[in-house]
């Protein structure tokens, strides 16, 4: 378990038993999320739809702390086709948000299966997406930090040594934070498993 903290913004859900209070499902599809399929993890089956179009299901949000903060999770997910995605989100509205996680993009300027950071401003994707090829099927830890108007995405294979994926400058109002999965265009059920979700304040 994490060390005791005096951080007033600290929050952690290890997804054992029931979801902790203050979580809010956006377009919940109860048949496609589970806390029992993989005990100790939240499994969300990646469906179609996009945040920007208000068509994705089972986006899980909670109030963001004020000031600077970092959100973190550990994700098991192996995307295999366009444009499957699962990861963290800092959210103002369907038009203004930042999502960071594992995804798949097969085109000339994409990294294929990899790590991506997508910033949407007024409904339009802001380049770059910092795509880095990543094909390991092992769980990967992800964290997304807000420091003023700087948003930074880092990842780690062991939860100790973190590497930078990318960073964007944004004036969004980070009202909510949480987990997101979607953008599957075709194919069958594709599970994404989140081992925990954590919030910490930053100086």
Identify the residue ranges that each predicted region occupies.
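Extracellular glycan-recognition regions
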Residues: 1-203
